[in-house]
Amino acid sequence: MAVKYIFVTGGVLSSLGKGITSSSIATLLQQSGYSVSILKIDPYINVDPGTMSPLEHGEVFVTCDGAETDLDIGHYERFLNKDFHKKNNFTTGQIYMSVIENERKGKYLGKTIQIVPHIVDEIKSRIKFAGEGSDFLVVELGGTVGDIEGMPYLEAMRQMKHELGGKQVISIHITLIPLMRAAGELKTKPTQHSVQELRRIGISPQILVARCEKNLDKELKRKLALSCDVDNDSVIVAQDTQSIYKCPLNFLEEGILTPIARHLELGELKPKMDNWDMLVKKIIAPKSNITIGFVGKYLSLKESYKSLIESLIHAGANTDTRVNIKWIDSEILVDNLALLYDVDSLLIPGGFGERGIEGKLEAIKYARIQQIPLLGICLGMQLSLIEFARNVLGMSEANSIEFDPQTKEPVIYLIENFIDSQGGVQLRTHTSPMGGTMRLGEYECHIKKGTKLYEAYGKQTLIKERHRHRYEANPHYRALFEKNGMIVSGESNGLIESIELANHPWFVGVQFHPEFTSRLQNPNPVILAFVKETLAHKKT
């Protein structure tokens, strides 16, 4: 069958859950037996989010092929239990860069370059490329209808509907139905205005998703259907819920597949959601609970750690455990070590820069001495080596050259002649451009037999995990570390990929980011092992 396109837009305001809605629709179609892909379009002019502050953008999600993408790509992978790639996310910056490069090469034969047709044609080309090989492509447009940045994309959507027809392209619009608490009344006017704005552009949505705090009655649904020119069964309620993973089940119950099937001329859709339903029930009402101390520095925007938070939920669902996160600000921890006393384990996530480092080092020292489970990820692993070097090996000046370029004991250093995932050699220095110059994407890791990592990965000796870092553990110190009980449990082409303490119940550090490959139906092995170990050592 020809690829069918489902365009998802948002109105009234941002952060309505377009990513979760897109993921949920794609999941229901996938579980109905179709092959489904998703594309996220980001209208900002940055080439990618790789150099954006986590506090500005949230998490940067890394795909298996090394793309630094929007965090919604993480939702897509976690819901559909499949890998996505560079082609599944593009920005206005990439569109303009491509068009300008083509103009410089003379590919437009001297014509004046304009938004229409050149920019819009490039957008349509990338949308179609993302859908190749799939039955469905769900396209999520970031931002809000009416934003000037989104206009070329809406024009591209309008043209695709005109070119391909209503049996191959549908539009789903998500809006907010605010609750006026003083009157206890839901208001539909913002939604009506949002749809009017979309129709002025030339797009009439076939399905309306109403995000709201409480359910809509039949009269409100009828009113929305009439004013927004959609069928009565095409007003779908997206009510606030206890878990994002319940959303596909809620949409299924609301009947969203009925108008989708009708407009795209599909047969009856019967998704198989039994296993999904079972896991959701374990998220909402688990038998056990644990508390993990999450020592970070981007705590004012917890979406900076989105994949890691979700990976703990996945591990919890698969162990029937509620994972409670105690957020601990590493910048205030040095003078407040009592914050660590009531947690069952500690998690030290990745990050960049010197701010908050001393607090993380104190947390690592506490876990090492008190024998409580610890998982250090990326920077967390590097700091575990620095803490061990300073407090066990007596190397008081041990540091990373990221924090002290002149350190006499560079336990963590920068590889200048770096071999990337395609086998190419990149020259890297402190002055190299920030964007795209890190170790990015999926790399192999050889695991040492008999280690905790070996057990976590089901006694596999070769795994693949994703990376996003610039600095590495210095192999010059490896023999000294191992002689004193810090085991190198994983490596890749001579690079140290994972470490663990010999005389400790569970003290593991990994240079890769296991959270990027965790899925609800397939939790990452090292995250799952960490949660299981935390449960085993839970404080009574």
UniProtKB/Swiss-Prot annotation:
Activity regulation, short description: Allosterically activated by GTP, when glutamine is the substrate; GTP has no effect on the reaction when ammonia is the substrate. The allosteric effector GTP functions by stabilizing the protein conformation that binds the tetrahedral intermediate(s) formed during glutamine hydrolysis. Inhibited by the product CTP, via allosteric rather than competitive inhibition.
Nucleotide-binding is among the record's keywords: yes
Domain annotation Glutamine amidotransferase type-1: ranges: 291-540
Binding-site positions, Mg(2+): D72, E140
GO CC annotation, single: cytosol
Disulfide bonds: none
Annotated catalysed reactions: UTP + L-glutamine + ATP + H2O = CTP + L-glutamate + ADP + phosphate + 2 H(+); L-glutamine + H2O = L-glutamate + NH4(+); UTP + NH4(+) + ATP = CTP + ADP + phosphate + 2 H(+)
Example GO molecular function: metal ion binding
Catalytic residue list: C378 (nucleophile), H513, E515
InterPro entries, A to Z: Class_I_gatase-like, CTP_synthase, CTP_synthase_N, GATASE, GATase1_CTP_Synthase, P-loop_NTPase
Pathway entry: Pyrimidine metabolism; CTP biosynthesis via de novo pathway; CTP from UDP: step 2/2
Record EC number: 6.3.4.2
Amidoligase domain as annotated region, ranges: 1-266
Sequence similarity: Belongs to the CTP synthase family.
Function comment: Catalyzes the ATP-dependent amination of UTP to CTP with either L-glutamine or ammonia as the source of nitrogen. Regulates intracellular CTP levels through interactions with the four ribonucleotide triphosphates.
Quaternary organization: Homotetramer.
Note: CTPSs have evolved a hybrid strategy for distinguishing between UTP and CTP. The overlapping regions of the product feedback inhibitory and substrate sites recognize a common feature in both compounds, the triphosphate moiety. To differentiate isosteric substrate and product pyrimidine rings, an additional pocket far from the expected kinase/ligase catalytic site, specifically recognizes the cytosine and ribose portions of the product inhibitor.
UniProt cross-references to HAMAP family, sorted A to Z: PyrG
Official protein name in the record: CTP synthase
Organism: Helicobacter hepaticus (strain ATCC 51449 / 3B1)
Lineage: Bacteria, Pseudomonadati, Campylobacterota, Epsilonproteobacteria, Campylobacterales
